[in-house]
Regions:
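A membrane-topology feature that recognizes alpha-helical transmembrane segments
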Residues: 1-346
């Protein structure tokens, strides 16, 4: 009974964090658009997706090189600075500008800058699991909102499709994401959601003891893993190996879920809310039927993914999550009266 409660608690916390990222991104869509934060001139251009995928490949190669050269402090510093920047984007549109000051003719929101600095400092001095997770929700919603208003429907679908394929190859094929995962786990940076399985769990105390032998993926782009799992056991057993020889998920203190697993499908949700020509369902948040069904499709994919992971094996996350987001979006778009051509952004 206790093990069941722990598992249900972990699943509930994971679903809650994904939902916060998605609802946060939807809430940020219109403020980001009004603030002029759209990142490209032509959001409908499919080449935007190719450029982003290329950037992902370059960034992955750079991170692997940093790990190989044993200069992980560069990666940690870069992620902390990026987290502060993304936090500023979010805080700049949600915090009142009452304390704004003028610098070179432009208004600067002092509260937003202070809050963003607080996020970076917290990551630097006390990267406990709740700091990592809270930061992940903030920057995940911000990143998804920014990309959502910058990628039209077709570019978003192409982006999610290509990244899902890349994720599967990098986890099950080349396995270079496994190297990246094991290299970033000790850095205590918000590239993963840390889901504790016990109330007493401390990410700081876990340190090298639980992560040093980790061979499972928990990376910036995708993949889901548990704290001490390996893709195969020391004898080379694969997914068909008898259940008794697999690690027991209930023996672990935490599971780790890549932040990208929450961000990438949410790009589709935000893009649907911004670009799909459907009637809004509620006021105060960018939510229409295609965005809602995309959100529900993501959640369905997440539950299937967690069911697979809780069996004790690591899995690529984006095939299920992105597939659910795209499939859910298309169902909602067609149900709202759009033609398939319109739904695909053609």
């Amino acid at each position: 009974m206790e093990d069941r409660t722990r598992l249900l608690g972990a699943v509930g916390l994971t679903v809650a964090m994904f939902l916060l990222v998605q609802l946060g991104a939807l809430a940020l869509v219109e403020p980001f658009q009004r603030a002029g934060y759209q990142q490209v001139e032509n959001p409908s251009d499919p080449t935007n997706s190719l450029l982003y995928v290329g950037a992902v490949l370059v960034l992955t190669a750079a991170m692997l090189a940093i790990i190989k050269l044993d200069v992980q402090w560069l990666l940690r510093g870069g992620i902390i600075l990026t987290s502060g920047l993304l936090s500023w984007y979010v805080f700049s549109v949600v915090m009142p500008a009452g304390l704004a000051v003028t610098v070179d003719g432009a208004a600067v929101n002092v509260l937003a800058i202070g809050a963003a600095l607080a996020v970076s400092v917290a990551l630097l001095v006390h990267p406990e699991w709740y700091v990592i997770d809270a930061t992940g929700v903030i920057i995940g919603a911000g990143a998804a909102g920014l990309f959502g208003i910058s990628f039209g429907l077709l570019p978003a679908i192409l982006l999610l499709g290509v990244l899902a394929i890349y994720d599967a190859i990098s986890v099950y094929g080349t396995e270079h994401m496994l190297t990246l995962a094991s290299g970033v786990m000790d850095l205590k940076i918000p590239v993963v959601f840390v889901v504790p399985m016990t109330l007493s769990y401390s990410y700081l105390d876990a340190g090298d003891d639980s992560d040093g032998d980790d061979d499972g993926p928990a990376d910036t782009e995708s993949s889901v893993d548990d704290a001490e799992d390996a893709v195969a056991n020391p004898d080379g057993a694969d997914a068909d190996h008898p259940e008794a020889e697999r690690p027991d998920i209930t023996d672990r203190d935490a599971i780790f879920i890549g932040l990208g697993d929450a961000v990438m499908p949410t790009v589709m949700v935000a893009s649907a809310a911004f670009f799909a020509e459907a009637e809004p369902l509620v006021s105060g948040i960018a939510l229409n039927l295609p965005a809602l069904t995309s959100l529900l499709g993501t959640m369905a994919g997440l539950l299937v993914l967690l069911w697979m992971v809780l069996k004790g094996r690591a899995h690529a996350g984006l095939p299920l999550l992105n597939g659910g987001a795209i499939g859910g979006y298309l169902i909602g778009a067609l149900a709202s009266g759009l033609t398939l051509t319109q739904a695909l952004g053609l």
